[in-house]
Amino acid sequence: MNDQDFAATISQTAQEVFRQPAVSYSADLVFREIPGFDSILAIQFILAIENALDIMLNEDEVDNMHTMGDLMTLVKAKKAA
């Protein structure tokens, strides 16, 4: 899977979980800026990403993710390992 595939999967998953298709899920998007974002949606999003990409994210990794770019960097590192 290349960077474009990761980005497409993450963007599609974000659209499905957050139900905000008008939002641009770019690398600089801060999660808290997504309309309706709350802790329940955050958990649902993380679980959906884990399932879609067959990875596991630990609590420290999730706590240090603030943007879509942070998530992309983490996903690439996980998949490369």
Protein language model regions, located:
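Charged low-complexity stretches with an acidic bias
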Residues: 63-81
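Glycine-rich loop motifs involved in handling phospho/adenylate chemistry
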Residues: 26-38, 59-69
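Alpha-helical structural signal
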Residues: 14, 42-43, 68
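Phosphopantetheinylated carrier protein domains
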Residues: 42-64
